[in-house]
Swiss-Prot record:
It comes from Hyphomonas neptunium (strain ATCC 15444). GO terms for cellular component: cytosol. Keywords: Autocatalytic cleavage, Cytoplasm, Decarboxylase, Lyase, Pantothenate biosynthesis, Pyruvate, Schiff base, Zymogen. InterPro entries: Asp_de-COase-like_dom_sf (IPR009010), Asp_decarbox (IPR003190). The gene is panD. This is Aspartate 1-decarboxylase.
Length: 118
């Protein structure tokens, strides 16, 4: 049996832009993608801590060092610049290995600076 387990999350991210007319996705600074292990075009969940909205989309690269978290397309109706969010990706893990699985957790601070990664 394969279990769906947390692969990685960006915790405490701040939305820096919303673009309703973009084709969709969430744009994430390449440094943050690298730190979390989330890949471009990978399916992610975004949970809006500010208002409770929860959506599923895919990640795109934003310029390295920009600290961008940009919610695009229809999802932009559920997010606003300044909202605090959690972005999570999941993976399939064989049940026998699930207890040994350890996700990557990246805690973000002001300006989407990395405070801690584990």
């Amino acid at each position: 049996m394969i279990l769906s387990m947390l692969k990685a999350k960006l915790h405490g991210a701040t939305v820096t832009q919303c673009d309703l007319h973009y084709e969709g996705s969430v744009s994430i600074d390449q440094d943050l993608l690298d730190a979390s292990g989330i890949l471009p075009h990978e399916k992610v969940d975004i949970w809006n801590v500010t208002n409770g909205a929860r959506i599923q989309t895919y990640a795109l690269e934003a310029p390295r060092g920009s600290r961008t978290i940009g919610v695009n397309g229809a999802a932009a109706r559920h997010f606003a610049v300044g909202d605090t969010v959690i972005i999570a990706a999941f993976c399939g893990v064989e049940a026998e290995k699930a207890r040994q699985h350890a996700p990557t957790v990246v805690l973000l601070g002001e300006g989407n600076e990395i405070k801690r990664a584990s």
